């Protein structure tokens, strides 16, 4: 069995075997809660306190079913690799110790495990997910297509999430706090102009616009910024002016002879029309 993150860490076969041997010898240890620190690479920036309370109640009733995973730091502390929600829950219960497995991972491996583990749980906000993808691309120097293959996701999914990081910080914060949805945010991307994006963001919040209403507002704002130019009429050529004036003079002569001539003139983009009506009687 291969290491679950070997595709990212680029372990060789020998290294994988050594890793598996170490894992087989790993034991669950009780570690003081006070000596544990959060993962500095944790993609989740907001923890739902209500859900932490629910988890604490479950742990109080059933105990810790799955130990947290940590790595030892130089200052005698232990940094969480996986299981921060469980650690926060036992703190609420007032536990002094928590069962943990200690792993020997470097910063790159620790960051990758934390990011991938959270992505697999599918509990991140769209902006946290986008940040996780961006960090994995940076850590492993991957293309979006390669990352998508390794995570088992579509390349368009990765690309759409990463576009959210181009939005103003205020919009990203709204996504983070779930004030707006990802589809609202995608509609704002189309505007490109930061001032307009923030103006519409406030309108979405104040008027509680749904996605369809937001998309309609974006369309109107784009149309207002880029009005369709009115078609320019072609100028009269010298020959055309002579022709029109000659017809007018002829009509005047006919009218002066006592014939009731009725005429209408109409200008079009490509031609000039003169309609002449002469009664039979």
UniProtKB/Swiss-Prot annotation:
Which residue ranges carry the DNA-binding annotation?
A: 145-164
Q: Which UniProt keywords apply?
A: Cell cycle, Cell division, Cytoplasm, DNA-binding, Septation
Xref: CDD domains: SPO0J_N (cd16393)
Q: Does the keyword Cell cycle apply?
A: yes
Q: Which GO terms describe its cellular component?
A: chromosome; cytoplasm; nucleoid
InterPro entries named in the record: Chromosome_partition/occlusion (IPR050336), Cro/C1-type_HTH (IPR001387), HTH_ParB/Spo0J (IPR041468), Nucleoid_occlusion_protein (IPR023705), ParB/RepB/Spo0J (IPR004437), ParB/Sulfiredoxin_dom (IPR003115), ParB/Sulfiredoxin_sf (IPR036086)
Top-rank taxon of the source lineage equals Bacteria
The record's Gene Ontology biological-process terms are:
chromosome segregation; division septum assembly; positive regulation of sporulation resulting in formation of a cellular spore
**Which Pfam family, any one of them, does this sequence belong to?**
HTH_ParB
SUPFAM superfamilies associated with the record: KorB DNA-binding domain-like, ParB/Sulfiredoxin
Report the GO molecular function annotations: DNA binding
Query: Localized where?
Result: Cytoplasm, Nucleoid
Summary of the function given for this chain in its UniProt record: Effects nucleoid occlusion by binding relatively nonspecifically to DNA and preventing the assembly of the division machinery in the vicinity of the nucleoid, especially under conditions that disturb the cell cycle. It helps to coordinate cell division and chromosome segregation by preventing the formation of the Z ring through the nucleoid, which would cause chromosome breakage.
By sequence similarity, the record places it as follows: Belongs to the ParB family.
PANTHER family per UniProt: CHROMOSOME-PARTITIONING PROTEIN PARB-RELATED (PTHR33375), NUCLEOID OCCLUSION PROTEIN (PTHR33375:SF8)
- Under what name is this protein listed? Nucleoid occlusion protein
Organism source for this protein? Geobacillus sp. (strain WCH70)
Task: Tell me the gene name.
Answer: noc
């Amino acid at each position: 069995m291969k290491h679950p993150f070997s595709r990212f860490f680029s372990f060789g076969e020998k290294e994988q075997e050594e890793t598996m041997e170490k894992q087989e010898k790993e034991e669950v240890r009780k570690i003081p809660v006070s000596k544990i620190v959060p993962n500095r690479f944790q993609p989740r920036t907001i923890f739902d306190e209500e859900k932490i309370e629910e988890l604490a109640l479950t742990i109080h009733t059933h105990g810790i079913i799955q130990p947290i995973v940590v790595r030892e730091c130089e200052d005698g502390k232990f940094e969480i690799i996986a299981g921060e929600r469980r650690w926060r829950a036992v703190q609420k219960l007032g536990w002094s110790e928590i069962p943990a497995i200690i792993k020997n991972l470097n910063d790159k491996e620790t960051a990758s495990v934390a990011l991938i583990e959270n992505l697999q749980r599918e509990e991140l906000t769209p902006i946290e997910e986008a940040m996780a993808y961006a960090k994995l691309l940076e850590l492993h120097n991957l293309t979006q297509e390669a990352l998508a293959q390794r995570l088992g996701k579509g390349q368009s999914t990765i690309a759409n999430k990463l576009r959210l990081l181009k939005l103003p910080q205020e919009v990203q914060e709204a996504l983070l706090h779930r004030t707006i949805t990802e589809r609202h945010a995608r509609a704002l991307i189309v505007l490109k102009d930061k001032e307009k994006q923030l103006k519409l963001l406030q309108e979405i919040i104040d008027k509680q616009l749904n996605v369809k209403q937001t998309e309609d507002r974006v369309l109107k704002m784009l149309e207002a910024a880029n009005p369709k130019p009115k078609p320019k009429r072609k100028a009269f050529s010298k020959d055309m002016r002579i022709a029109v004036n000659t017809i007018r003079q002829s009509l005047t002569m006919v009218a002066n002879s006592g014939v009731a001539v009725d005429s209408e003139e109409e200008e079009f983009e490509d031609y000039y029309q003169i309609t002449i009506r002469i009664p039979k009687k």
